[in-house]
Amino acid sequence: MKDNPISLFHELESYVRGSKDTLHRYMYACILEQRLADLLLLSRCGVHPDDEDRLAVRLASQRSLCVQAASDLAEGTEEARGSTPAWPDCKVTKSSAAQKRPELLSLVKVMQELRTPECSGYDLCDLEVCREDALHWLRDHADPSSPPVLIGVRTGGAFYAPLWSSALQQRWGNKALYHTVRALRMPSDPGASLYLPEELSILPAAIEPDTDIVILEDQPHTGGTVLELAGRLSAKYRLNKPVWVSSPGRLFQIENGRLAKCSDRIPLNTGTRKRIWQMLGNSEEVAEFLLPKLGLTDAHPADLEAVPYKSVPQWNDPMYRREVPFRINPKKTPFYIRRKSTNEPVVFAKFIGKDLFGDFQFHQLKKFEKYFPDILAYQDGYVMTKYEPGLKEMREMFVNMPSAVTREICQSVSGYWKTLLDSCQISGGHPVHPLADHWQARLGEMEDFIGRKLPYDLDWFERSLHTEWTSSAHVYTSLPYANQYGHWKARLSAGQRLKTYRFHIDSTWGGTSSIEVELASFLLENRVRPDDFRLLVNQVKKEAGSLTIEAVTDALPIACVLQAANLLKQAKDESRLSKELILSEAMQSFEYLQAMKPKLSDVR
């Protein structure tokens, strides 16, 4: 998994180097701690060549840096101190990990991704409250004579544990250390958590009988992740007292194999001004706050209102903390700013994450400005763009427009993948696409849902889904969540000037994908003709030397299964797509693929 010099992670390192923001530096330090801890785990499992002792020393040093950065953050230090450590490369591929230790596949996948923790994406908190959580635990729930063993569960817990350690060092100095462990997924049961003995053995060999253990984790859902870890720790240390669990603002104890809530408070800093996502539901407040930032010189506050793109569920309001599970989740709450007098939308606002993750995402997004409406502002994790009325779906244009127009579309959108390769490339991608294991089950579920058999070539799909993409360029992208044709639009002006748009470029909730699958998804969703297929692939090939038309053709069935999986998801979530719409879309896609298959031999 050797990192490309232009990889996403080196882009992140460069961005943080240019920032003096203490929160940016703190979160990057925690991301780096996770990277080093994962590398040490791979080394101890015999699949990474780096020296264990050297990695262990560097990891201990990095954790000290995390605690210092946590103290700076909690104390309100205005400007970050010290240098930004370099991003450590990794020389492990998924195929080599699979051959030696199949259970490490999920770890290598995690290491390819810039995962947004819940605290920055969809269970928002102000991180500094975690330090107050630790002091609250000391004051109201425990009076230990020795420092507790602090264990953060990577990913989320790695951002909380240093803040606890920083608080506890006020009493115990450098003895208040912390550790992190990675919860992996069992190959035989993806819903179950797995902690490897090679990592648990790094924890203290023994502890005093009255020592407390505190596990730091994102908000527990079922509690399965922390309950499994607590069980392993109880066996390791022969515990005679309950294990504590903390997520931002919350404290639990494990009693009789269950999580019992001890305290709960809204995890927001009361000294911080109100953010947009705290104003949701109050249209006038949102509009009045944003107007000075949007450059709408002809608008008056009384004539503007904020209108949810979707309904704003009450559980997004901090006052509804009693709801379970509770989240402050702006991911679900895009909105328009609209003129009351004309009902005309003028601004569209979408949340892309807060703190370092949102800020870096916005930094990346600006590289794609050519494919965006005009960006008016970025505030509190929301990107606000000029509302663009009258856009046409690109699919409609590929189907109905003359070849001169569709060729121009292909020329225009090819630059999107160039920018993606330049800014979001990762290394060591998937030898076989993740959908390969269960693709027939997914299509079977779709057939059951629509009550029809899908027309597809079983051999072609089986060969495609098990293609090894080891020589491909891989990117971190929004594709797994935003591959529908509705994300691609265009406008042809009266003077025949073409402007193309790609919506939902942000990969805050994204994943890894090969460039072949990226292109195949675009071609399938937009019903691209064979000649345009060839033109687009050859344009992108200029930036991705290993790309071939044959490989993109081989990826088309993957795009079809990916679309089916997303349609099924939308049938179940809040959007609740109708059965009739899903039937129409699925059948058209599979029929398009069947009709295209004999023509693709000419494209090759």
UniProtKB/Swiss-Prot annotation:
Record flagged with keyword Glycosyltransferase: yes
Superkingdom of this protein's organism: Bacteria
pH dependence remark: Optimum pH is 7.5.
Gene Ontology terms, MF aspect: pentosyltransferase activity
Pathway: Antibiotic biosynthesis; butirosin biosynthesis
Keywords in alphabetical order: Antibiotic biosynthesis, Glycosyltransferase, Transferase
Protein purpose: Catalyzes phosphoribosylation of neamine using 5-phosphoribosyl-1-diphosphate (PRPP) as a phosphoribosyl donor to generate 5''-phosphoribostamycin in the biosynthetic pathway of butirosin.
Protein's name in the database: Neamine phosphoribosyltransferase
